[in-house]
Design a protein with these regions (language model features):
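Nucleotide/phosphate-binding catalytic cleft detector across ATP-hydrolyzing
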Residues: 1-156, 164-281, 288-343
Length: 343
């Protein structure tokens, strides 16, 4: 039994869940996947063990992602997944429940917010607070958001891309679009079917994205050998795919992200745009690691763009750092991003 309740920060992402424990840092990074027995409803595996079962389960076992496009699509499975992860991190805490901050996309609705809060409470939290992902990402990237200075953060996760201009600990202008890492994988599926008549699995698409995926021309082309099923013969097929092909495959989702960035800049007050020109654009999230994304944004906006150090963990780190402000929260506070109490 845990003797002292721990404050916990959770990056509840479509692709992964990262858990930050106060005083310890990020202690868990697992895929947002659960495996269940359809006949009994029994939860079999969560996280990495469940992900390994994607596309490889017998008829009575199904591996699913309970979050889609940044929000809960299966409430029961999300609650059970969170319960397992929290138990793994802090053990039994029936008498000493933790306070928890959970990250959410900036465009989330009140109904979706309530679903996240309720899932956290049912999973074992004493109290649940929310923080918008770009705010947490900025804090995790080391940006001092309390100053009257404009900063732009582009957080590309698994289900959503969140773009925000932040100043004085608040979001001045933002956009959240359902185009991110999952849509890049979907673009690979479509491209492989259209160009090669080959069907590839989810894990293969993820491998292609991370090894040869790019959104800006590379100085030296790279290739990868992939295995899939030929749609003509129905038999296994091995082909080589190049990074140049990924440029073509990713064109549509990349353009939508660029349009969202341009839209936020257009709506931002001129003084803050000047600040952003000086401070640059900071990218976070797993999607920011697709090769050349920073170069492309810089080329299209004319603003210096960098990928944050440890971009995948920035949101979780920022959530964790926000735990220090919980004692200052007023009763009834739910979404920390809408109250300037982060400093």
């Amino acid at each position: 039994m845990c003797s002292i309740a721990k404050d916990i920060g959770i990056d509840l992402g479509t692709a992964s869940v990262l858990v930050y424990v106060k005083g310890k840092g990020v202690v868990l990074n697992e895929p947002s996947v659960v495996a269940i027995d359809k006949n009994t409803g029994k939860l079999l595996k969560v996280g990495a063990e469940a992900q390994a079962m994607l596309g490889r389960t017998p008829g009575n076992i199904v591996a699913i992602r309970p979050l889609r496009e940044g929000v809960i699509s299966d409430y029961d499975m999300t609650e059970r997944m969170l319960r397992e992860f929290l138990h793994k991190v802090v053990g039994g805490f029936q008498l000493f429940k933790p306070r928890v901050i959970i990250c959410v996309p900036s465009g989330i609705t009140e109904v979706e917010e309530r679903a996240v809060v309720d899932a956290g409470i049912q999973a074992g939290a004493r109290r649940v607070y929310l923080i918008e992902e770009p705010v947490a990402a900025a804090i995790g990237a080391g940006i001092d958001i309390s100053k009257p200075d404009g900063h732009m953060v582009v957080d590309i996760g698994g289900g959503t891309s969140d773009i925000a201009v932040i100043s004085l600990s608040g979001v001045v202008e933002s956009a959240s679009i359902k185009v991110a890492g999952d849509q890049f994988n979907e673009a690979i599926f479509k491209y492989m079917r259209r160009k090669h008549n080959v069907l590839v699995g989810e894990r293969t698409a993820e491998l292609m994205k991370m090894q040869i995926g790019c959104v800006f021309p590379k100085e030296q082309e790279t290739t990868i050998e992939i295995k899939g099923r030929c749609l003509v013969t129905g038999l296994p097929k091995v082909i080589n795919v190049s990074s140049t092909e990924m440029l073509e495959a990713f064109e549509e989702p990349v353009e939508r992200i660029l349009e969202a960035i341009h839209g936020v800049l257009e709506r931002t007050p001129p003084e803050l745009v000047a600040d952003i020109s000086n401070n640059g654009i900071v990218m976070t999230g797993g999607g920011s690691l697709v090769d050349g994304f920073d170069k492309l944004i810089e080329a299209r906006t004319g603003i210096h763009t960098i990928v944050a150090e440890d971009a995948i963990s920035c949101v979780a780190e920022g959530t964790g750092k926000s735990l220090d402000s919980l004692n200052d929260m007023q009763d009834g506070t739910v979404n920390l991003s809408r109250r300037k109490q982060m400093n």
